[in-house]
C-alpha cells in the first residue's frame, strides 16, 4: 500500500482515483499531478514503481493537503468569527452562512429538531 501525504492509498484502484483519497485532492487535481509527473492514470496503485511514488510525493508536496489544509480552513473560519463579520457570526451561531433560508430547511446546519410538548387532544366522545 503506497503511503503519500500520510494517507494509505488503496492498492486495487487506479492511481487517478486513489489520489482523491487525500484530503484536498479531487479528480481534476489528481489528473494535473499525474500529467505533471508523467504517470499513466490507468496504472493501479500496486503497480507503481518507487520512482513513480517519489515523483508523486514531490508533486503533492507543492499543494496544501490533509492537516495543513484543514488547519488553514479552521484558521480562516476563526478569523471571520474574531472580526465579528456577518459570516463569522453565522458560523458562531451554527446557522447557514451563504444566505440560505432558515425559517424551514436548515436542519443539516442547525441539528435535529427539538420536540416541544404540545397540547393534547381530548379523547373523542361516543
Swiss-Prot record:
What is the name listed in the Swiss-Prot or TrEMBL entry for this protein?
Small ribosomal subunit protein uS13
Q: Which GO terms describe its cellular component?
A: cytosol; small ribosomal subunit
Report which gene this protein is encoded by: rpsM
A GO term, aspect molecular function: rRNA binding
Which residues pair up as cystines? none
Q: Where is the composition biased (Basic residues)?
A: 100-126
The entry's function note states: Located at the top of the head of the 30S subunit, it contacts several helices of the 16S rRNA. In the 70S ribosome it contacts the 23S rRNA (bridge B1a) and protein L5 of the 50S subunit (bridge B1b), connecting the 2 subunits; these bridges are implicated in subunit movement. Contacts the tRNAs in the A and P-sites.
Question: What InterPro entries does the annotation carry?
Answer: Rbsml_uS13_C, Ribosomal_uS13, Ribosomal_uS13-like_H2TH, Ribosomal_uS13_bac-type, Ribosomal_uS13_CS
Tell me the segments the record calls region Disordered: 96-126
Question: Subunit structure of this entry?
Answer: Part of the 30S ribosomal subunit. Forms a loose heterodimer with protein S19. Forms two bridges to the 50S subunit in the 70S ribosome.
Amino acid at each position: 500500500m503506497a503511503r503519500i501525504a500520510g494517507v494509505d492509498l488503496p492498492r486495487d484502484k487506479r492511481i487517478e482515483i486513489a489520489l482523491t483519497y487525500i484530503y484536498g485532492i479531487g479528480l481534476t487535481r489528481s489528473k494535473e499531478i499525474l500529467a505533471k509527473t508523467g504517470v499513466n492514470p490507468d496504472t493501479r496503485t500496486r503497480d507503481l514503481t518507487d520512482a513513480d511514488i517519489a515523483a508523486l510525493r514531490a508533486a503533492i508536496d507543492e499543494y496544501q493537503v490533509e492537516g495543513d489544509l484543514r488547519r488553514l480552513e479552521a484558521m480562516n473560519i476563526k478569523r471571520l468569527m474574531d472580526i465579528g463579520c456577518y459570516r463569522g457570526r453565522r458560523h458562531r451561531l451554527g446557522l447557514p452562512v451563504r444566505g440560505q433560508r432558515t425559517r424551514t430547511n436548515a436542519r443539516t446546519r442547525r441539528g435535529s429538531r427539538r420536540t416541544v410538548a404540545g397540547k393534547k387532544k381530548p379523547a373523542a366522545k361516543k
